[in-house]
Amino acid sequence: MKYPILLALLMAATVAQAASSQEYVFKDQPFESGSLSTDGKEFSISTVSSRGNLCDLGGRLKNNIYRDDEGCEIHFAFSGNKVRVTTPETAREACSKYCGFNAYFTDDYYRLPAACTETAAKNSEQRFQTAYRAKQYTQAAQIKQQYLNACNSFMFITEQMRARNDLAVAYKNSGNKTACRAALQPLRRHWSDKAEHHSYVYRDAFMKELAAAKFNWNACR
């Protein structure tokens, strides 16, 4: 995926992990981001809250538990494509030192689908742009729709908005105004949002995509 700045910061912490590590991320949390990388022996976690505050931690696991020397204890429960990260109540204060104000890392993390990796997303975008520039608008819309169907739950809000705007324009140019409006419908809940409602971290990009969505909606009526 094309991550915004805060996601780029988040992912940078996991670059040093071994190639065999699995990558897990937050799901259905479009205003927050979280990344867990682990090979079962070591782990690295980075999260960014909706206000731009971070958690950053890592270490060695023993029986799927991490303990530092200062009372922090973290449990990892692996189940299929999901990892649940928890801390005992008695360890929460000690673990809070890894996070900024109101940031957290205890949550469910989901394995990122193959279609949603950065490489796959770049390939999908290239195919979309190639089809769009060739005026193959129906094909371009199909490519973008498939990507959204697979990856929407794992995308940051501004990514979702950008992808839906691209999809809407492709549908409009293909002559399918009904599908154009359907692509934008999930964004209409934000129609009345003001800049001050959102964090400085993504505010400018959010308002830019919101303005584009409103313009595209009117163009598809």
Which residues does each PLM region occupy?
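Alpha-helical junction/boundary sensor with strong preference for TPR arrays
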Residues: K144, A150-N152, H190-K194, H198
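N-terminal glycine/threonine-rich, aromatic-flanked beta-hairpin/loop signature
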Residues: V25-N63, T90, A141-M155
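Edge beta-strand at a domain terminus
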Residues: D56-N63, A91-S124
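Tryptophan-anchored aromatic micro-motifs
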Residues: A19-E32, L61, D68, F105-R111, ...
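TPR/TPR-like alpha-solenoid helical repeat scaffolds
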Residues: T158-V169, D193-R221
